[in-house]
């Protein structure tokens, strides 16, 4: 039996190895070469052995130094193209997006855990257009977002109160965990109408979204289910699905009772809930596309996976940079004190008048993008920069590399928010996060850009400004002691994952600014 299996695998490996590299199907592209590629391409694994760094973006940077800003690899049997400059980003994500690169690459984990209905991942088409329009017009429109502003303010003040208690007791605070609680509770209340505690499950979902199995890339292994990958997917699904089922059922009961009261909202009951809007559409027989329960579940997972971990991780990176760069922290504090004053707490509406705080957010996303490697799938072959890009190829955009490339950023390894405020009238000050400046794409670009970019950046800026206004953060070392002087810095080591979090939790003892903290308990 083992001999037969070994022979079978050897034959498969030889078949994959000897199978020719796909060439362009259309006559107009047949004369074009594929992007440069390392030699040799190994049987079975292709070029996977070249990804020898713990973090994918670092391996891709090393390869780009040898093969240029546009090169091709084989992840097992899957053709893969790596893109590493803003100029090429624009060709892929703007010039040719509509025809060739409007679809994202999905793994089995993404398909299963989003019920194969993720608006972030489903192929471009009528359903995607319909759901995207629903999200932008009915869930994330200005009126709805503004109605939920008090809720977001409450969640930020919860964080500040926890920090104030830590400051009073001098007990070290795991800031990493508090930030995850903040984003989980905020998204949960906006989406579901209650603070459902699912951050551990959401974290596991994001973790496996950022992982790959050999079965994703070596097609003969798909039926074999090698390793624990599929089992982990099933385990996470079996934990997550009952929670969503329970919340939807509970929400339907609340809606039923509300109808019996002729739509009257009870005292203390949240009036604006995203899930209500989705259930309204599901019950509307006149809708052009009928929304199913599975599609609603997929959207719930979308909001949690996109809004919980990524915002918490980015905010933690920002706080870490502020701890390590006291000059930036002092300048930010002076701005907050000048604009907001010391008689009230920062409000989300203040962010528009805090340009340096907004620049800190941009600088954080430049150095620590939520998605360091953005993925698309080529759905129609095309020509890019004199090369043929084959249909079905996985496209990897190394956003992390561009954010630290000295060709596009002055002193790129320095955390310097001023770069977004300098040279008034030209240059960096015009760079925003909306996907039109291809040297800064933390939320993607084009049709597949994250729809919640404004909500995420406003929340992050408000929390940062609030913490800056109220506290200093004293770093706690491994032994639980507060670090002083040059030792009072935090590690900026990255960890593997879809959003590339810090490798170590941020643990601090907050130090209250006496003028601000009492207001936390009187508001």
Curated annotation (Swiss-Prot):
Membrane topology: Single-pass membrane protein
EC number: 1.14.14.87
Source domain of life: Eukaryota
Annotated organism of origin: Glycyrrhiza uralensis
Function: 2-hydroxyisoflavanone synthase, which catalyzes the hydroxylation associated with 1,2-aryl migration of flavanones. Converts liquiritigenin and naringenin into highly unstable precursors of the isoflavones daidzein and genistein.
GO biological process: isoflavonoid biosynthetic process
CC terms in the record's Gene Ontology section: endoplasmic reticulum; intracellular membrane-bounded organelle; membrane
Stated name of the protein: 2-hydroxyisoflavanone synthase
Catalytic activity: (2S)-liquiritigenin + reduced [NADPH--hemoprotein reductase] + O2 = (2R,3S)-2,4',7-trihydroxyisoflavanone + oxidized [NADPH--hemoprotein reductase] + H2O + H(+); (2S)-naringenin + reduced [NADPH--hemoprotein reductase] + O2 = 2-hydroxy-2,3-dihydrogenistein + oxidized [NADPH--hemoprotein reductase] + H2O + H(+)
Pfam family, one: p450
Membrane-traversing stretches: 2-22
InterPro entries, A to Z: Cyt_P450 (IPR001128), Cyt_P450_CS (IPR017972), Cyt_P450_E_grp-I (IPR002401), Cyt_P450_sf (IPR036396)
UniProt keyword terms in alphabetical order: Endoplasmic reticulum, Heme, Iron, Membrane, Metal-binding, Microsome, Monooxygenase, NADP, Oxidoreductase, Transmembrane, Transmembrane helix
Top-level EC class as recorded in UniProt: oxidoreductase
Family matches, as Gene3D superfamilies: Cytochrome P450
Protein family according to the UniProt entry: Belongs to the cytochrome P450 family.
Gene Ontology molecular function terms on file: 2-hydroxyisoflavanone synthase activity; heme binding; iron ion binding; oxidoreductase activity, acting on paired donors, with incorporation or reduction of molecular oxygen, NAD(P)H as one donor, and incorporation of one atom of oxygen
Positions that bind heme: 450
Cellular compartments annotated: Microsome membrane
Cofactor: heme
Chief localisation class: membrane
